[in-house]
Design a protein with these regions (language model features):
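Amphipathic, charge-rich alpha-helical segments that serve as recognition/docking helices
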Residues: 121-153
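Enriched - but not universal
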Residues: 33-35, 77, 103
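Intrinsically disordered, low-complexity segments enriched in proline/serine/threonine
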Residues: 4, 9-10, 47-50, 55, ...
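Glycine-rich short-loop/terminal segments
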Residues: 1-65
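A short, basic-hydrophobic beta/loop patch
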Residues: 10, 80-134
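Short alpha-helix boundary/capping and kink motifs at helix termini
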Residues: 40-97, 107
Length: 153
């Protein structure tokens, strides 16, 4: 596999930075620094937008499927005034990078709307920590003929 001509990018993570991991349909793992996303929002202030979970078909069944380890008891305690954070994804969709518990609380309590931010594509690139390609299967070897007969791979 040839190396990229592009110089490696240095990513700094603080001990308290929250990193969100997402595995797409191809098996590629994406890791984003959500804490840095909020810092970028502070550096380029913008008003929060509104997100309506029901408009996207989000209910508790959906949340439990997408986030199997969701702590519903903790979700009941989170601050709904803090905007959730989306980032644009390469397939034209948006990915929730931070705010799963806030989203769960809103759905559980029937709160129709949450404040949210969406990073720009440039900001999303800045908060990308690493993209790990899917694990590939080792190539299948063809049987070999040897002096003792056909050898299985």
């Amino acid at each position: 596999m040839p190396f990229s001509e592009e110089p490696p990018r240095v990513v700094r993570l603080g001990l308290s930075d929250q990193v969100f991991t997402f595995t797409d349909a191809t098996g590629t793992e994406w890791h984003w620094n959500a804490s840095l996303g909020y810092q970028l929002i502070e550096q380029a202030p913008r008003p929060p937008m509104e997100f309506y979970p029901s408009d996207s078909g989000i209910d508790m069944t959906h949340l439990r499927q997408r986030y199997p380890s969701l702590n519903e008891e903790y979700a009941k305690t989170v601050d709904l005034s803090r905007p959730i954070l989306f980032l644009p994804f390469h397939d034209g969709t948006s990915v929730l990078c931070d705010g799963w518990h806030r989203l769960a609380r809103a759905v559980m309590e029937g709160i129709p709307c949450l404040p949210c931010y969406e990073l720009t594509p440039e900001e999303a690139e800045q908060v990308l920590v690493i993209k790990i390609p899917p694990k590939s299967q080792p190539p299948k070897l063809a049987p070999m003929d040897t002096q003792k007969g056909r050898r299985k791979p």
